[in-house]
Regions:
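Conserved hydrolase catalytic core segment
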Residues: 100-142
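Catalytic active-site module of serine/aspartate enzymes centered on a nucleophile-bearing elbow/loop
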Residues: 270-304
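Conserved acidic catalytic loop of the alpha/beta-hydrolase fold
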Residues: 84-101
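Short beta-strand/loop motif that positions the catalytic acidic residue
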Residues: 241, 247-249, 253
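Alpha/beta-hydrolase
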Residues: 147-236
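N-terminal cap/lid segment of alpha/beta-hydrolase-fold proteins
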Residues: 6-27
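Conserved alpha/beta-hydrolase "acid-adjacent" motif
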Residues: 254-260
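Conserved HGGG/HGGXW glycine-rich cap/lid loop of the alpha/beta-hydrolase fold
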Residues: 21-73
Length: 304
């Protein structure tokens, strides 16, 4: 999976925000390189995949992966909306000494990346959304249609409210962490399409389990708050997106069905969509980082 290149050294940073919260992020790459902000999925940790870190080095960008509030050591922000991630991203960029950046969001990170494109002004120059969910109540999109059983159960609990959702997620967290890699695999089984089943082995399976461990080490706050935010208004208008948006969607995705990608491709201005018939959800994380980052790198280098 890692190829022959040596990845840049990855460092973890914790900063204190103006409101007193802690923000947790990883950074990899040269300080002077253009910055890509990585917003992971739900409920993924923010430690960079080796394939993503390597792709960043190849394309000449620095990458910073942010743990949203409630994940890892980032302090919870109760009742947060999707849009609430934007001030955190800007604060992280300020600490890193970066004025302009691009944003990549995968799966549950996708809406948050779009929020940056809509609300961060001229500081965000481009967005990539990979296997991103669409808005819950969007006209013309049946959010749950085509999703695997696990996702249907999860969002069904979210609609019943925070108490019921938390009860479910606490149980799932215990099962995942207690059973190791096999627990992670079992938790994903109902949403793994054939292409994703093929890659959920070996080093990648270990990374995914460690990612879940990192995200959930302090509880399920981030996971639950993500789910609740997805079932509510996102807090911004997609029509406000004026930056280039690169959309990647696998046609064999059971976590986020391709209808979400097609809907976003129509709804988002300046969207350049790639709908890939052979890909699922996890295959995008493993096999496509270099292509995804190449789009963003071109936009960032164009700002020089």
């Amino acid at each position: 999976m890692c190829g022959s290149l040596v990845a840049m050294a990855m460092t973890r940073q914790l900063i204190t925000l103006a409101d007193g919260r802690t923000l947790d992020f990883f950074v990899s790459g040269d300080d002077g390189a253009p910055l890509v902000v990585d917003l992971p999925g739900t409920p993924e940790g923010h430690r960079l995949l080796p394939s993503l870190e390597e792709a960043a080095a190849t394309t000449g960008v620095r990458i910073a992966a942010l743990a949203r509030p409630g994940y890892a050591d980032s302090t919870r922000l109760p009742g947060r909306t999707v849009a609430d991630v934007v001030p955190d991203v800007l604060a992280m960029a300020d600490v890193l000494g970066v004025q302009q950046f691009a944003v990549m969001g995968t799966s549950g990170g996708g809406p948050h990346a779009l929020a940056c494109g809509a609300l961060a002004g001229d500081r965000c120059v481009a967005v990539a959304v990979v296997s991103s969910v669409g808005p819950w109540a969007a006209e013309g999109l049946d959010f749950l249609d085509g999703m695997g059983e696990g996702n249907e159960v999860e969002f069904g609990a979210a609609l019943e409210g925070e108490k019921q959702l938390r009860k479910l997620l606490v149980l799932w967290r215990e099962e995942i962490l207690a059973a190791g890699e096999q627990g992670t695999l079992a938790s994903l089984q109902s949403v793994l399409s054939p292409p994703d089943q093929k890659v959920m082995t070996g080093e990648f399976a270990r990374h995914m389990h460690e990612s879940f461990q990192l995200a959930l080490e302090n509880g399920v706050d981030g996971w639950g708050d993500d789910d609740l935010a997805f079932t509510r208004p996102w807090g911004f208008d997609l029509a406000r997106l004026g930056v280039p948006v690169f959309l990647w969607q696998g046609e064999q995705d059971l976590m986020v069905p391709p209808a979400h990608g097609r809907w976003l491709a129509e709804a988002v201005p300046n969207c350049r969509a790639r709908l890939l018939p052979e890909d699922g959800h996890l295959t995008m994380l493993l096999n496509r980082p270099a292509e995804i980052l190449a789009d963003l790198a071109a936009e960032l280098h164009g700002q020089d």
